[in-house]
């Protein structure tokens, strides 16, 4: 008996409906399968699934940090002048209108830590076994601008690393509370156990790092190297690139260490006293202990764990530390001198062949106003595209291509109130490279 027409249509309709349901279920199953393959909590970091393009796409979709507005970050990082000019013009229009994230914003958003970490897109899992097996320690000294601190922390954060944060005792209470609120969301980020009031160019800047050194050595995290940062620093390498660079040091340290000029020698010729600021006295200092020749550098270092241990425990190191406490800007000659001391692990000899400039060391990339100029005429770098503070460039978008060509781990100075576009593009660049291993 033949099936009537309406029955045929009904069967065909049921068939199409079922086929549609099965297709929908297949799509859902495929998406779920992709998500499960990228479940970093249960996935082998060396597995093909984790390293696959599909998995990386899923990760990047959830963790990307695209620049706001319509600036061309890919072009800016490649040095495309049209993209750079557009970003600089855009910055002139928006920087006066831009409202930075406030202490109150962070106090509110961190009430729910999981929401905070997800919304601010912190990477909460190791991206490779190499990174997992090579934890890095950070000493982060801050005193203002909570947004700068949070963005720096997000940029250098990895769950296998360990972070000590020193907040200036003189900082506003709301700032200190906001820092505490942020770090309370991470098991591997903590406040230094001893906080000091930090006075510019005085011993207290070194003491802040020493306090973090003591705390970090007490940590159960088997970190290999210590990097120190301030609030205007930002990384220019991914965590994976940092691990590779630190492994290549093979136990050596990396920091500026050069023969001081006569001008710099005056910094330790007379004693300085501290009240609300640093004052020069007429009291002459004795020569450095242990007939140690003095060297000069900057406040930043890439130091091995063994070096840090000897800073705190070696009697000769302790004598030098006591001696520099009443000098001007001791952070700019203490580390540089210890780096040349023969008893310090990872140090290099006194000989002039081992002098290390800030451009040779990997600790920090800085543009000094006095050295800017025409590169074709021998200047080390082109003029700053941002502004200057204490003769140091606060970077603009026009500096980013040059920045990324250098081998340093971090650069200084950045400030979103001066140029947020350069920071946004650097964030986008680093996040893309962290996930994919390639540039924008």
UniProtKB/Swiss-Prot annotation:
- Write out the GO MF terms: acetylgalactosaminyl-O-glycosyl-glycoprotein beta-1,6-N-acetylglucosaminyltransferase activity; beta-1,3-galactosyl-O-glycosyl-glycoprotein beta-1,6-N-acetylglucosaminyltransferase activity; N-acetyllactosaminide beta-1,6-N-acetylglucosaminyltransferase activity
Q: In which pathway does it act?
A: Protein modification; protein glycosylation
Q: Which regions face the Cytoplasmic side of the membrane?
A: 1-12
Q: Name one GO biological process term.
A: protein glycosylation
Task: Provide the Gene Ontology terms for cellular component.
Answer: Golgi membrane
Lumenal topological domain: 31-440
Q: Which cysteines are joined by disulfide bonds?
A: 73-230, 164-384, 185-212, 393-425
- Entry EC number(s): 2.4.1.102, 2.4.1.148, 2.4.1.150
Q: Which residues cross the membrane?
A: 13-30
UniProt's post-translational modification comment states: N-glycosylated.
Keywords, comma-separated and alphabetical: Disulfide bond, Glycoprotein, Glycosyltransferase, Golgi apparatus, Membrane, Signal-anchor, Transferase, Transmembrane, Transmembrane helix
Provide the function of this protein: Glycosyltransferase that can synthesize all known mucin beta 6 N-acetylglucosaminides. Mediates core 2 and core 4 O-glycan branching, 2 important steps in mucin-type biosynthesis. Also has I-branching enzyme activity by converting linear into branched poly-N-acetyllactosaminoglycans, leading to introduce the blood group I antigen during embryonic development.
Q: What is the designated name of this protein?
A: Beta-1,3-galactosyl-O-glycosyl-glycoprotein beta-1,6-N-acetylglucosaminyltransferase 3
